[in-house]
Amino acid sequence: MNETTNEQEVLLLRRKLDLLLRTGKLLMESAADTNRIERNMKRVAAYLGIPEEKLHIDIRWTMLMVNVSDEKHSFSKFQKCEKHGINMEAISKISKLSWRAIEQDYSLDKYEEELEKIARQERNYTPYVVAICTGFACGGFCKLFGVTGLLF
């Protein structure tokens, strides 16, 4: 019976780490900054009951890595991030979801369902809008530092 309990605990921890990584992946692929990703992932880990002192998060452009370790065990999971784009609405919704999950004590199924709703939503910005706005941002940056219209 003890072995079965141990296996169930490991499966539950793996599921929690998977949810944590999917949260981070959505943030990364929506162009959230590293501090926001880490802050939100730590908040979600707190909701999931993973102690911060046992949690290790490493954020790279194409990979998220999470490790939970104590004196006896160490569990690591990795998540590849491939579809980078801009989606400020997803970033905002994930942050609000993490707070709601804590305040309303969501079940893992409820959290996963809400996370999937956010993941399925279409992005607000088409590539053309992003390209045009990037051009305006670059132009504004040039104007800020005194570049004249002739040089621009």
Give short role names for the model-derived ranges.
Residues 1-106:
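Soluble N-terminal domains of membrane-associated systems
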Residues 113-123:
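Cytosolic juxtamembrane amphipathic/interface segments immediately preceding
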